[in-house]
């Protein structure tokens, strides 16, 4: 197996593209692909300030590295969720992230949820006792809220997350099987800013998980290998497995599935519900001022306020 570009021994074969690369040309290919997606969806420019959500995992550190190498002004945000019960997931991932930023001289903001709000994510979830043992929904809510808040407070032009093609295809699969039209109308990789909400972009939306892992390993990025202990047995992981089976039989399946969705979205197949600015101004959280659909407090303030 030889590199398509230089004829040297290849270290990776991308079956769905039917190409192989040596280390150097694979890393270059990843940067080119990411830049292409940024341009294709008009995500952001080099003059804008970006806030990258980093977890210490392969996807977010690879993305941050690529954005930095491409010359984007990308700062990192790490949220310490306080998930240390089964392994040291949060403490270890905080350390990987800190070292990554330090080695490159990048700006990293870290927030310890427990220090800030008095409870870790598992503690918040246990208190709210919604009949679920896992804290994933509370965790998602807190992460979305704080990422948005810190981006707005820091006057960033866009929030950047490292959702890869496997993540997007698995969400899509779940949303299609449940016919969640509401979600299907919102899964575009670029969501423009609206009242109270920062712009959100996903530059890895066409990058396979395997590729972002290979990028991290081949470029010597130290990242946390363990997953969040609560992700075990999740629907998202199960859907990823199903899609991997399809991909094994039909290389390129995930790409086709995702790009087909984007075409359908563009053709108006799903309602793209963008709340109008006036509507968002109507109701504001009494505590934090965020637009909210409920009276009084927003869901985040209700969760941390109890
Ligand atoms: Fe949030 Fe696992 S519960 S990362
Ligand atoms: Zn090569
Ligand atoms: Zn609020």
Where are these regions (language model features)?
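ATP-dependent adenylation/nucleotidyltransferase module used to activate substrates
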Residues: 2-185, 194-197, 209-219, 285, ...
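Flexible helical/loop "lid" subdomain adjacent to adenine-nucleotide binding pockets
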Residues: 39, 166-170, 174-204, 209-212, ...
